Amino acid sequence: MPIVEFKNVSRIYVSGDHEQKALDKVSFSLDEGKFVVILGPSGAGKSTLLNLLGGLDSPTEGKIYVSGKDISALSNDELADYRASTVGFVFQFYNLVPTLTVKENVMLVNEIAPNAFPAEKMLEEVGLSDHLNNFPSELSGGEQQRVSIARALAKNPKILLCDEPSGALDSETGVMVLKVLLSMAKNYGKTIVIVTHNQNIAKMADVVIRVKNGKIKSVTEQAEPMSADEVEW
C-alpha cells in the first residue's frame, strides 16, 4: 500500500466573488522510503500540495490518504496530532529559536513527539556533534539548515516535507544539505518530499512530480537518480 495517495484533490480559494483553483483534480501515489521532488514554476500549486500533505490545509474536494488514513476527514485537533506524529517540516528559512542552543532547538520536538529520537543522535547524523552548545547566530547558513533538518527528523516522522530547503544557500552548501536529506531517506526509510523550481535537484529523485497550473503534468520514476555531487547547479 502506498504511504501517500491523492485522489481527485482540488483546492479552491475564494475571495469575495473571485475563485482561484490552486489545484485541479490532482491524483498520484507515493511509496514509502522514496526521495520525491515536486517540480514546477512559481504559482504552479507546489506549495499547496505540500500544505495539504502536511495537514496545514484541507482540500476543497477529493481525498488524501496517508498510511491508509483519510487525513482530509480529520478534525483540527486530529490534524494537530497528525502534524506532531507523522510529518516533519523543513523550510527555506530555518525558523530556529535564537535564544536556544543547537541541542535545545532540536529538543523542542520532545514536547510534541512521543517517539522522538535523541537530539544528540540526529545532530550527529547531520554532522553537528561539535556544535551542540552553540547558538544559531554562531552558525553558517548551511549549518543552521542542518539544525532544522535534525529537528524535523528528531520527531521520527514518516514523511519529511521540504519547501525549497537549499533555496537560500550557495551551491556547495546546498549540495551538503541535499546529501543529508538523501542519507536520511536511505538510512531511516523516511519518505522525503521536496518542493522546488530547481530542475537540477529533480535529477536526484526517485520520483519526480511535475506540476503546472494546478495540475499534475507527469509523474516520472527514475531508476538511476544522480547523487548530489553529480548534479550541476
Task: Give the predicted meaning of each segment.
Residues 2-211:
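ABC family nucleotide-binding domain
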Residues 215-233:
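Conserved beta-strand-loop-alpha-helix hinge in the C-terminal portion
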